[in-house]
Regions:
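Extended alpha-helical targeting/anchoring segments
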Residues: 1-211
Length: 211
């Protein structure tokens, strides 16, 4: 992209549209991996039962359903709070699916659902007002989306998280956490650090390679 590059390994689709079906895959609810498979299995069970993490996740499932309902119908939650393991964290993941109305374009569905609720919070418009008010720096590429759209209206964009922006010989990367009424500031800050672990590890490996 001219004088900059974006690269990473996003775990979350912003929205997927295929054959007039739209999907949103909310990811919310995060525990750190321990590096021990047996302990990670215990952590996964704890995550699936954690009231705060589940409440956070269901808020975003409801938001996804609301966003898709603007120009979609026959909405279903096809995957509900599935525990998924990533390199450094464990997440709860759902899949919300809806049929797109015949009169609605793919780009309208994208507009209805952007930005992802996992990056904004809910209610979405009020949350974005608070983000603009309280965040000290612009998000830039962070929380946007990148992917493709074909001539048949099929669309697949990943949310730009767990990703780098390379510009003018500097690497920029960000992470965040969703704050709810039961959140503890120290825990949310630790979640941010946990989400950055894979990127930090990638930089460490790159430095070793070029030594």
């Amino acid at each position: 992209f001219g004088n900059f590059k974006i690269f990473g390994s996003s775990p979350e689709a912003q929205i997927v549209v295929k054959n007039n079906i739209a999907e949103i895959h909310p990811i919310a609810g995060t525990f750190i991996r321990t590096g021990n498979d047996s302990e990670d299995k215990k952590k996964a069970i704890e995550l699936s039962k954690d009231l705060k993490e589940n409440a956070e996740h269901m808020m975003l499932v409801d938001l996804a359903r609301n966003d898709l309902s603007r120009n979609g119908y026959n909405l279903k939650v096809k995957k509900d709070r599935e525990v998924q393991f990533y390199s450094h964290v464990i997440h709860l993941v759902s899949k919300v699916v809806g049929q797109i109305k015949k009169s609605t374009s793919t780009l309208q569905i994208v507009a209805d659902t952007f930005p992802a609720g996992t990056l904004s919070g809910a209610p979405k418009h009020k949350a974005m007002e608070l983000i603009n008010k309280y965040e000290n720096s612009e998000r830039s590429f962070y929380g946007g989306s990148i992917g493709f759209m074909d001539f048949d209206g099929n669309f697949n964009h990943a949310i730009i998280i767990r990703s780098f922006l390379s510009k003018n010989n500097f690497l920029h990367f960000q992470a965040g956490a969703l704050v709810v009424s039961k959140s503890k500031p120290e825990s949310e800050l630790q979640e941010v650090y946990n989400k950055l672990k894979a990127l930090n590890k990638a930089m460490e490996n790159a430095e070793k390679y070029y030594e």
